[in-house]
């Protein structure tokens, strides 16, 4: 039993939405599921698994420029911004930080719904609760000398 986790992150690598599919399912299924919930953005960075003409067209209809390298099997190569594509490592870093949680890394939960809930909990704690904590206050000493 294996699964694929598809994710959308913001420019800082914080997760915005997740979708889980079976491991043998094509990446196009995850792309189609996440397409409706995409936030307003200028660019969409994705790996070769998301290279499909219908997906590129759907992104452009939403006003999003795709930055997805073409599959090796394409007859005509697709041009993409290689400099911008380098920043895709932020999503890989996000997946790595999620796997710091042992329950997520070892796939402790066999039920996909419970596993997905563990991922959502880990993402909430790692990325969103840490940004909501108040800034440290400046300590003012009032000692009299």
What are the functions of these language-model segments?
Residues 37-38, 81-83:
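Short hydrophobic "helix-edge" motifs at membrane interfaces and signal-peptide entry regions
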Residues 1-73, 122-123, 135-145:
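Polybasic low-complexity intrinsically disordered regions
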Residues 76-77:
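Short, conserved micro-motifs composed of acidic
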Residues 56-63, 82-145:
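Basic, amphipathic alpha-helical segments enriched in Lys/Arg and hydrophobic/aromatic residues
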